[in-house]
Structures are given as structure tokens and as C-alpha cells.
């Protein structure tokens, strides 16, 4: 059987069930509120275990609420699809893509497409074989907040060829093990998107792989709300910790570099902990050390400390309490 729940009825509630071992193909969910072009709106998916299904665990639709579910071990992906006014909160989303679908296509924790007013908050997203949380293609007015995103194979949070978003108060660590070429192992990746604010996140890069927070620009064309360009993005008041030699943070392009670097993208008031501040841990018109990054007008009011100096400062502050 492909689906546990399939249909276009409105205001359906699915609560307190174990939904497992359905033979849903890729891009289809064990919970699937659509038939052809007809969609069921206003579904509430609450307090379920959704596991071990072959394709996707939950496909979204307009007005869906997904809360307090255990979405683990699904063959392709935990949660995904198209819908407006969707809330995804307080779920555990883990160990998805056991079937080994191509992570750069559509696999891992959750992937949202063509959403408006999507809210993703307080989820524990870990050990997915792909990106942890991913908005890809014409998403706008997105909020990611208070999520705990760790140890996913791809980027932790990725906002790609999309528009206005806020990424705030998230904890990200150890993401990017399976996709560490160039910037594809970033903890937070803003890719060909505009008007994104990234603030008050804690980001930790593994000593052997991964990157911090990156803005990236490539040739990607245009979408529903305008060109897919990396402009008007503001990264501020985040703490980025590099545990070892691996990783950088900043902005990079493989096309039309000036649009990226002259496009009102800015890093302000961020703090960094690094093995040494003379290491090339920052990227802006090339890879640079801390002084070089600030010389480009980035994070002029930010701070960077070695792990040793940070420990000394922290101990001094503790002693004064």
C-alpha cells in the first residue's frame, strides 16, 4: 500500500498514530493530502510516529500544521512539497533517506518548495542523509527559528533560489559531512536568494569538515518574484565556532562576482571563535584572515578570538561574578 492517508478532504486531523512501512514512491508521502491537482487544506498532523516509509513521510499542503511528530527513517525524506501558511514545529526529523536518493536532488530531512509564510520552529533535525532543512524554489516570507540542526550529511539550513526569509535563534553543529566540496557543507547556506536576515544563531563547524554561514551566487535565472540573485542579505549577531582547521565563512560566487560583493550583502556584529585569528577562515573577494575580512568592510563591529583567548576571557568573567 502506497499511502496511509490520501485525499483532498479539508480540515483532517491525524493524531497519535504509528504510520510505518508504506510503499510510497519518491516524492509521495505516507501522508499525502493531494490527488492530481486537487489538494486537501487545513490538515493537522500531531503526535504521530511516521517512520520506515519508502518515499516521504509527510507531504505538505496549504494550511497544514505538523507538530510534535517523530519523523524518522523514511526512505527519501521526512517532510516536503508545496503549500502556503504551513507550520512545522516541535518535531524530531532524523535518519531520513535510508534508501540513498541523491541528496542534491531531493532527500534528507525536509524540503519545501514554492511556499509562502512557512514557519519551521523548535524542531530537532539530525542525522539525515542530505540537507537538514531546505527551502528550494520560490519560497517567500519564510521563518526558521529555534531549531536544533546537527550532524546532517548536507547543509544544516539551506535557502535556495528563493526570497525573503528570517533565519534566527537556531543551533547548528556538525552538518556537511557528506557534501563538503566548496561551500556545500555550510551550517547555514543562503544560495541565490535575496532579502534574507540571518541572526542570533549558534553555528559550530566540525574540526574535519563543514563551513559556517555562507552567501553563494551562481547563474540560476529568475523565478516567480524576480531574479535568483544573492543581494540584500544581512548576517548579524551570530556566533560561529571553528573547532579546527576545516571550514570558512562569508560569501562566494562562481558567476558575476560583483553582483554578490556590491549587492548590499553584509556581515555585522558577528562573533567568531577560531584556533587562531591569523587563519584564513573568512571569504570575501577571496579567502582571508580576520583583519583581511574586516578590511573589506565586513564585521567591522564584530569580534574574533582564539579558543585560548576566549577561554581566558570567559574564566575572568566567571571570576568576577
Model-derived features: positions:
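LRR N-terminal entry segment and analogous cap-like coil->beta motifs
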Residues: 11, 16-22
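Glycine- and acidic/polar-rich repeat regions and solenoidal domains
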Residues: 2-5, 20-42, 51-61, 72-319
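Serine-dependent protease modules
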Residues: 65-66
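Extended acidic/polar, glycine-enriched regions
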Residues: 1-2, 6-8, 13
Amino acid at each position: 500500500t502506497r499511502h496511509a492517508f490520501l485525499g483532498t478532504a479539508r480540515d483532517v486531523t491525524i493524531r497519535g498514530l504509528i504510520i510505518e512501512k508504506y510503499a510510497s514512491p519518491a516524492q509521495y508521502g505516507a501522508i499525502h493530502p493531494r490527488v492530481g491537482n486537487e489538494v486537501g487544506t487545513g490538515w493537522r498532523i500531531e503526535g504521530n510516529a511516521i517512520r520506515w516509509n519508502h518515499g516521504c513521510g509527510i507531504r505538505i499542503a496549504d494550511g497544514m500544521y505538523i507538530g510534535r511528530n517523530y519523523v524518522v527513517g523514511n526512505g527519501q525524506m521526512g517532510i516536503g512539497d508545496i503549500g502556503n501558511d504551513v507550520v512545522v514545529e516541535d518535531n524530531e526529523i532524523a535518519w531520513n533517506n535510508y534508501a540513498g536518493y541523491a541528496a542534491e536532488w531531493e532527500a534528507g530531512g525536509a524540503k519545501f518548495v514554492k511556499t509562502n509564510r512557512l514557519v519551521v520552529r523548535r524542531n530537532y533535525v539530525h542525522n539525515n542523509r542530505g540537507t537538514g532543512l531546505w527551502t528550494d524554489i520560490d519560497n517567500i516570507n519564510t521563518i526558521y527559528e529555534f531549531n536544533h540542526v546537527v550532524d546532517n550529511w548536507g547543509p544544516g539550513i539551506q535557502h535556495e533560489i528563493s526570497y525573503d526569509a528570517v533565519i534566527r535563534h537556531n543551533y547548528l553543529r556538525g552538518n556537511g559531512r557528506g557534501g563538503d566540496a566548496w561551500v556545500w557543507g555550510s551550517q547555514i547556506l543562503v544560495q541565490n536568494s535575496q532579502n534574507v536576515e540571518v541572526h542570533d544563531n549558534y553555528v559550530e563547524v566540525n574540526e574535519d569538515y563543514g563551513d559556517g554561514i555562507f552567501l553563494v551566487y551562481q547563474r540560476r535565472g529568475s523565478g516567480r518574484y524576480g531574479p535568483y540573485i544573492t543581494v540584500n542579505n544581512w548576517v548579524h549577531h551570530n556566533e560561529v565556532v571553528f573547532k579546527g582547521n576545516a571550514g570558512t565563512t562569508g560569501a562566494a560566487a562562481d558567476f558575476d562576482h560583483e553582483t554578490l560583493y556590491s549587492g548590499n550583502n553584509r556581515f555585522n556584529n558577528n562573533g567568531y571563535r577560531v584556533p587562531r585569528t591569523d587563519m584564513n577562515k573568512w571569504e570575501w573577494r577571496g579567502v582571508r584572515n580576520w583583519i583581511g575580512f574586516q578590511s573589506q568592510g565586513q564585521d567591522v563591529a564584530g569580534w574574533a578570538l582564539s579558543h585560548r583567548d576566549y577561554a581566558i576571557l570567559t574564566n575572568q568573567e566567571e571570576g568576577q561574578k
